[in-house]
From Swiss-Prot:
Assembly information from the UniProt record: Monomer.
Alphabetical list of InterPro entries matching this protein: Clx_II_MBL, Glyoxalase_II_hydrolase, HAGH_C, Hydroxyacylglutathione_Hdrlase, Metallo-B-lactamas, RibonucZ/Hydroxyglut_hydro
SUPFAM superfamilies per record: Metallo-hydrolase/oxidoreductase
Keyword hit for Zinc: yes
Organism superkingdom: Bacteria
Pfam families: HAGH_C, Lactamase_B
Gene that encodes it: gloB
Protein name: Hydroxyacylglutathione hydrolase
Amino acid sequence: MRLTPLPAFDNNYIWTLIAPDGRAIIVDPGQALPILEAHSKGLIPTAILLTHHHADHIGGVPELLERWPTLPVYAPHDTRIALNYHRIGEGDSLNILGLRFQVIHTPGHTHSHLTFIGNDLLFCGDTLFSLGCGQIFEGTPTQMLASLQRLAALPIQTRVCCGHEYTLSNAAFALHVDPTNTALQKRRQQANAMRLAGLPTLPISLESELNTNPFLRTAAPTIHAATATHLQRTPIDEVEVFATLRHWKNNFPIKNIP
């Protein structure tokens, strides 16, 4: 299977897993055009997986269903997803094109957000980003931290497939919080070179994220110290460390909003 991120909008990725015969699993098609263009080159849509209800992740589905009316769509139970689809949730599993994916509920960015895990791949929508995490639009910091901790416990070789290309803007904040992290410094340099070459910085290994993403390192002494300095007091617990980081990032001069 070939894993390919298709750019959409300014910074979205539509993820595709393509079999040798062209049949493909499509994750979060916010636009139809990238899929239609890929179809002209041999891609055959076989199933759509949706992580959450936001338009930049599901907006292309109606047009794709007009073209392929029997195309199965799998998405969370959410009345805001106005589609004919298979409702799935925590504990479900999907078997598509010989691949098995576990479905886990990762609330925080939205109440019903799902993540798909399988074949050493993690399709996490707007829960986990390269060097960052999604904003908390509907959930709580406690929920979002718990969701991220579930993802952090996966095998370190897992490849993280995020919904947006935010690595460089996230790196600016991460280095502000954790400036002496040499692995983070190296990642920023590598990401900058990749973007200058027109390449995606994703997927990225979970191991790399665990070493460099401040939102996955809330128990690390350096991150705890940085948030204490920012708050001008000692954080109460790890949830407050996380909530402080998220609020800090929301107001950081260089940012992207999913």
